[in-house]
Design a protein with these regions (language model features):
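Non-transmembrane "mature" sequence context
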Residues: 1-130
Length: 130
């Protein structure tokens, strides 16, 4: 489903390049010290979002979504707000990784989340719903 609230959204083929660094499910499990089933459960519970990328179409998660402690705490609520606006998972990923010069930090909404601007990102996510 296309969403006109995503500025200059790239095609699905460009999602892999837009996000940049991805972690496969096994790599993510190793990084977090979790079993593969536990990593998959994070996706089912929408603590993380992923996409099939690469030449082998492997389910992967953007590396910016996790730190040493696990999934970034601001992500699930942001996923919910964007999902409530009827964005698909690929559209949510595009929105989070598309650069926005009007943010309080340089980069994309994911960079603003990483810098601690969760409220600002969620406000913009709510605006994208309308």
């Amino acid at each position: 489903m296309a969403n006109d609230n995503i500025p200059d959204a790239p095609d699905d083929d460009d999602l892999e390049q837009l996000v940049g660094e991805w972690l496969t499910i096994p790599d993510l499990g190793e990084r977090l010290g979790l079993r593969l089933s536990d990593v998959r459960q994070l996706l089912v519970d929408r603590q993380l979002l992923g996409a099939r990328v690469g030449p082998r179409n492997v389910m992967s998660v953007p590396s910016k979504f996790v730190d040493e402690a696990g999934p970034l705490p601001g992500l699930p609520g942001t996923f919910t707000v964007l999902g409530d606006s009827r964005m698909s998972d690929p559209e949510i990923l595009r929105w989070l990784f598309t650069p926005d010069a009007t943010l309080p930090v340089a980069g994309a909404p994911i960079d603003a989340l990483l810098a601690g601007f969760k409220t600002e990102v969620r406000r913009r996510a709510m605006e994208a719903a309308f």
